[in-house]
């Protein structure tokens, strides 16, 4: 049966949507989705549910009840061709005698890149690459970025008043955004493998940094909570050190006392030391990537956000605009960047919509105006 380009895109978008279901549990693997189509109808759906579990293609094959001979397979990422925790997906595709495989994106992993396509073509299967490319790229951007750069995809998150203040003149920020916005942050944290916060924010707000569902229950998988504290100024009774909400890492320097470090290590906190005077943020990100982090959420405050901006380490951002005005005596989102219009940081706004009584703006970083 002839399938139009519009139908092909429809099927791939369905695969992308399926892949998103695995976004929380799949990392450090990519959240891949797959649909199987025969005679113009979807007969199988699948997505990768977590490390060590069957890949999307296998799940889709297990979901169908018809013969796969002559079927078309739509998958958001190039099928693997190597043995890992699971067998190669290309072997299953070849054995099942499918007619065609539509792939949205090639896998940048050197163990797979173009090799999966080559294996399928050698077996006489028609392969088409690029259908739904933009949709799949938008979904899998953290995975693609981490594989290509060795750094996790860094998302800056902040809440601000309509005039751009992240706290009032007393330094208080709870709460600028509304309740629905705060619930939305729970999902954003769950989709990240690490959440980074600065010492001043911990001292002022005493956050748990846990990822909670709208019901108030913790997500089954919690992000690593990372506290950037060069001198060990965060008190030992801060809620962030509580192991009940997941693992914690202290990113610090030689300025932090051995006694403070030992007390935290005794509680199960991992300690990562950087350069003598201040935490090397790029090295920290490299370390988090080595631990399997694909996406990192930087929650601030302004000093930490500004440090990431100065080093051009921010890839995207989410701003929750609360329905308030605070004047100019609070804390701005960013400090001391020394930028003018002709060398300003340029971003592409990708989404803006209401979340309860707050406005959520999503953006991706493009670069500086001066190139």
Swiss-Prot record:
Gene3D superfamilies: Cytidine Deaminase, domain 2, Dihydrofolate Reductase, subunit A. It catalyses: 2,5-diamino-6-hydroxy-4-(5-phosphoribosylamino)-pyrimidine + H2O + H(+) = 5-amino-6-(5-phospho-D-ribosylamino)uracil + NH4(+); 5-amino-6-(5-phospho-D-ribitylamino)uracil + NADP(+) = 5-amino-6-(5-phospho-D-ribosylamino)uracil + NADPH + H(+). Residues 151-371 are annotated as: Reductase. NADP(+) binds at residues 159, 175, 201, 205, 230, 301-307. Keywords: Hydrolase, Metal-binding, Multifunctional enzyme, NADP, Oxidoreductase, Riboflavin biosynthesis, Zinc. One of its GO terms (biological process) is riboflavin biosynthetic process. Substrate binds at residues 173, 189, 209, 212, 299. Zn(2+) binds at residues 55, 80, 89. GO terms for molecular function: 5-amino-6-(5-phosphoribosylamino)uracil reductase activity; diaminohydroxyphosphoribosylaminopyrimidine deaminase activity; metal ion binding; NADP binding. Residues 1-150 are annotated as: Deaminase. Its cofactor is Zn(2+). Pathway: Cofactor biosynthesis; riboflavin biosynthesis; 5-amino-6-(D-ribitylamino)uracil from GTP: step 2/4; Cofactor biosynthesis; riboflavin biosynthesis; 5-amino-6-(D-ribitylamino)uracil from GTP: step 3/4. The active site is at 57 (proton donor). In the N-terminal section; belongs to the cytidine and deoxycytidylate deaminase family. In the C-terminal section; belongs to the HTP reductase family. Converts 2,5-diamino-6-(ribosylamino)-4(3h)-pyrimidinone 5'-phosphate into 5-amino-6-(ribosylamino)-2,4(1h,3h)-pyrimidinedione 5'-phosphate. This is Riboflavin biosynthesis protein RibD. The gene is ribD.
């Amino acid at each position: 049966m002839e399938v139009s380009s519009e139908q092909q895109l429809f099927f791939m978008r369905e695969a992308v949507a399926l892949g998103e279901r695995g976004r929380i549990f799949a990392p450090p693997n990519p959240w891949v989705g797959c649909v199987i189509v025969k005679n113009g109808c979807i007969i199988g759906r699948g997505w990768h549910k977590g490390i060590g579990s069957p890949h999307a293609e296998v799940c889709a094959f297990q979901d169908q009840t018809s013969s796969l001979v002559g079927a078309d397979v739509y998958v958001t990422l190039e099928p693997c061709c190597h043995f890992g925790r699971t067998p190669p997906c290309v072997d299953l595709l070849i054995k099942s005698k499918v007619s065609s495989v539509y792939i949205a994106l090639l896998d940048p992993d050197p163990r797979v890149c173009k090799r999966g396509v080559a294996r399928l073509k050698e077996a006489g299967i028609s392969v088409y690459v690029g259908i739904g490319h933009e949709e799949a790229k938008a979904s899998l951007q953290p995975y693609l970025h981490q594989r290509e750069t060795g750094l996790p995809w860094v998302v800056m998150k902040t809440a601000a008043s309509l005039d751009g203040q992240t706290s009032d003149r007393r330094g208080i920020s709870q709460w600028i955004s509304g309740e629905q916005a705060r619930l939305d942050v729970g999902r954003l944290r769950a989709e990240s493998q690490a959440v980074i916060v600065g010492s001043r924010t911990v001292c002022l707000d005493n956050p748990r940094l846990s990822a909670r569902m709208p019901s108030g229950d913790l997500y089954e998988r919690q992000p690593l909570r990372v506290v950037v504290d060069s001198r060990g100024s965060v008190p030992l009774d801060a809620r962030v050190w509580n192991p009940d909400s997941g693992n914690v890492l202290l990113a610090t320097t030689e300025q932090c006392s051995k006694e403070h470090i030992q007390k935290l290590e005794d509680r199960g906190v991992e300690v990562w030391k950087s350069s003598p005077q201040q935490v090397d943020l790029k090295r920290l990100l490299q370390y988090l990537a080595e631990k399997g982090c694909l996406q990192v959420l930087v929650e601030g405050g302004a000093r930490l956000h500004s440090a990431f901006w100065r080093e051009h380490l921010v890839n995207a951002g989410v701003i929750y605009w609360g329905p308030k005005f605070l004047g100019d005596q609070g804390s701005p989102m960013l400090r001391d960047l020394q930028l003018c219009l002709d060398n300003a940081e340029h971003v592409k706004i990708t989404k803006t919509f209401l979340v309860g009584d707050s406005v959520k703006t999503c953006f991706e970083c493009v670069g500086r105006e001066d190139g």
